[in-house]
């Protein structure tokens, strides 16, 4: 899991490349699924890590500036709180790469984050996938696109990470047609996904029906 996402986030043409010159600070509590992967990546890469304690918008922004934080992740509600606070203090956040998950990031929120200088993209996953399956990417050749097109790219579900086998299937487990119209359930396989639920064999069996983890999400 950790090595897979290090490989995926360290490629040179990836807009959110995570490398040993970054300074990492999580913007979500450690008990949240957001905190289950990146701290291990940061440790393996030898990255400086900052852990804020109380999650107060002003304190988080102060630490980002004081510690020169360059890489983080959070849910949309936390990002909105930071942006609201930064309207008052007007810190330069142009060095910050931020991954958003937990719920969909709206185009308006992404645009507001960009107006504050934050390099923000969406990711998709769930607690059972610990945490990411996919992440939005802006390849180097697309970085001169219009702001409108870039916002679209930033808010997309993105592409599967390394070692992730992702499918969208119908009720018969057949892959749906890729026509931007047909929908089905998102199912996944990867080495780090949960095996099941404690003391709930039936739910665990249903989760992995057909050899894939069933997200219950429509794609």
Describe every region a protein language model picked out.
Residues 5-23, 31-70, 85:
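Conserved AMP-binding/adenylation subdomain of ANL enzymes
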Residues 44, 69-74, 83-152, 165, ...:
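Gly/Ser/Thr-rich phosphate-binding loop
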Residues 26-27, 51, 99-101, 156, ...:
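Thr-Gly-centered strand-to-loop micro-motif
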Residues 5, 56, 78-79, 105, ...:
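Alpha-helix capping/helix-boundary segments
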Residues 28-32, 125, 191-192, 210:
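AMP-binding (ANL) adenylation modules
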Residues 157, 178-179, 185-219:
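Conserved ATP-binding/catalytic segment of the ANL
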